[in-house]
């Protein structure tokens, strides 16, 4: 009971930190906002300067929150489905496949913009299915699976590089220049994906069982591995449709697991909040380090995530010895 109360208190503290960070991000920028500016806006409803800043910053903040949460949860689901603590949508090529499909859809069927998350999901499925098929045949260990994923990532990014030589082929570049329609599109995918994840979370702990143990209790482990993997790909692909590729947010789950343990009923909510906070901080730092220039949030995530991935690979190899 005491441990549960501590986790609840920690979760509330993280929520407060997330809200505080969102407020700081909202009032910070080339044009700063004061509390009085916001108070005047919400009491009188008339402040054109604040209105313009709201339309610039608030969609960006909301998208950062949703994308961070979705990618962190996607990482947790992928790791559960593949039984690999190194799995992450960007590393295994899922994001690259989704981005290629997104680019092709915008070139040939731009009128389906609202359906981009679903269409990108189809592209993200291809590298995921390749990983699954190869793993079923060769039984990769954790590091070998990631190496195959990196090879797919490089291959698909090469294809993407060729496609983007076409001046009409536009791909999203991070969190900049986001508008309210992007928020609405992503919100639908976020609500659907995260609600399904919460419904699925009681079964995720059972994915750690081997096939014999699962069958002995009547648990269809193959079905739930597929459902979990598909949901992970959907969450990651939906974010790619709006912001493009963001690296390493999925492996933050390893840190969350150290904090709260491996119970997915607890791990998923904590990953949601910490993932949202991490991307929001990365975006905020990118805006304030060298104004008026902006450092992409993805660059900051790569600087932090690269050493973390090296550490996880070394730890995985040490555990095999």
Swiss-Prot record:
Keywords: Cell membrane, Iron, Membrane, Transmembrane, Transmembrane helix, Transport. GO terms for molecular function: transmembrane transporter activity. It is a multi-pass membrane protein. Disulfide bonds: none annotated. GO terms for cellular component: plasma membrane. SUPFAM superfamilies: ABC transporter involved in vitamin B12 uptake, BtuC. Induction: Repressed by fur in the presence of iron. It is found in: Cell membrane. GO terms for biological process: siderophore-dependent iron import into cell. Belongs to the binding-protein-dependent transport system permease family. FecCD subfamily. Part of the binding-protein-dependent transport system for heme-iron. Responsible for the translocation of the substrate across the membrane. This is Probable heme-iron transport system permease protein IsdF. It comes from Staphylococcus aureus (strain NCTC 8325 / PS 47).
């Amino acid at each position: 009971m005491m441990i549960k109360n501590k986790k609840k208190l920690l979760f509330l503290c993280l929520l407060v930190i997330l809200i505080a960070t969102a407020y700081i991000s909202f009032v910070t920028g080339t044009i700063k906002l004061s509390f009085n500016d916001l108070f005047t806006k919400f009491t009188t409803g008339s402040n054109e300067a604040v209105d313009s800043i709201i339309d610039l910053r608030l969609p960006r903040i909301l998208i950062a929150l949703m994308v961070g949460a979705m990618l962190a949860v996607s990482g947790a689901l992928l790791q559960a489905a593949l039984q690999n603590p190194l799995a992450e949508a960007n590393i295994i090529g899922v994001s690259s496949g989704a981005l290629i499909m997104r680019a092709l859809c915008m070139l040939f069927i731009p009128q389906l913009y609202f359906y981009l998350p679903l269409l990108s999901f189809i592209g993200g499925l291809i590298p995921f299915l390749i990983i699954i098929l190869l793993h079923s045949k060769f039984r990769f260990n954790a590091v070998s699976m990631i190496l195959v994923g990196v090879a797919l990532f490089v291959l698909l990014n090469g294809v993407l590089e060729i496609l983007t030589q076409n001046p009409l082929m536009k791909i999203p570049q991070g969190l900049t220049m986001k508008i309210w329609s992007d928020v609405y599109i992503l919100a639908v995918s976020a609500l659907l994906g995260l609600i399904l994840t919460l419904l699925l979370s009681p079964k995720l702990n059972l994915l750690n069982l081997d096939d014999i143990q699962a069958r002995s209790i009547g648990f269809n482990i193959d079905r739930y591995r597929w459902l979990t993997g598909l949901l992970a790909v959907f969450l990651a692909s939906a974010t790619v449709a709006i912001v493009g590729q963001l690296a390493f947010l999925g492996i933050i789950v390893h840190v969350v697991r150290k904090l709260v343990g491996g119970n997915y009923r607890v791990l998923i909510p904590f990953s949601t909040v910490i993932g949202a906070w991490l991307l929001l901080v990365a975006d905020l730092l990118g805006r304030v380090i060298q104004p008026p220039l902006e450092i992409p949030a993805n660059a900051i995530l790569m600087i932090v995530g690269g050493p973390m991935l090296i550490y996880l690979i070394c730890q995985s190899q040490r555990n095999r010895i």
